[in-house]
UniProtKB/Swiss-Prot annotation:
One GO CC term on file: cytoplasm
Subcellular location: Cytoplasm
Keyword annotations: Cytoplasm, Endonuclease, Hydrolase, Nuclease, tRNA processing
Pfam families associated with the record: RNase_P_Rpp14
InterPro entries per the UniProt record, alphabetical: Pop5/Rpp14/Rnp2-like (IPR002759), Rnp2-like_sf (IPR038085)
Protein source organism: Saccharolobus solfataricus (strain ATCC 35092 / DSM 1617 / JCM 11322 / P2) (Sulfolobus solfataricus)
Enzyme Commission number(s) from the entry: 3.1.26.5
Hydrolase is among the record's keywords: yes
Protein name: Ribonuclease P protein component 2
Alphabetical list of HAMAP family matching this protein: RNase_P_2 (MF_00755)
Main location: cytoplasm
Annotated catalysed reactions: Endonucleolytic cleavage of RNA, removing 5'-extranucleotides from tRNA precursor
GO terms (BP aspect): tRNA 5'-leader removal
Amino acid sequence: MNSIQLIIDIILILWILILTVLYFKRRQLNVDIVKNKKIIRAKRYIVFYVISEYKVKGDDLERVIRNSLKDLLGSVWLNIANPKVVTYREDTQEGIISTNRVGYKAVLASLPFAKEINNNKILIVPRRTTGSLKKAKKLIGLK
């Protein structure tokens, strides 16, 4: 009877040891994934143009884009995406919005909700999303 109990105890101890080792390996793996901040910092640039009867200023455009994102998904996604109008050409009404890799789809989804600037109706149409500012500037005809 004692020998059977001893064997069961040894098997249980080995089982607990194996589970503990697997748990710590998994925990260590998750920590390595979280430390990778490149995913969050990677930039995306959205090239867009504005359809409007009147000329639109870049500052007003950024304010409207930020408000539409806040109305659609809330202030948490506004802080995550942090959209900024990097370049805006008032003559052709084309521009570039800078955001990060996590929030660029949220910014794209909120662009149709930006409908009005200073009681003038507008429509913001995204043309392309790129990973480099140089390529985005080339698409709107700068440099």
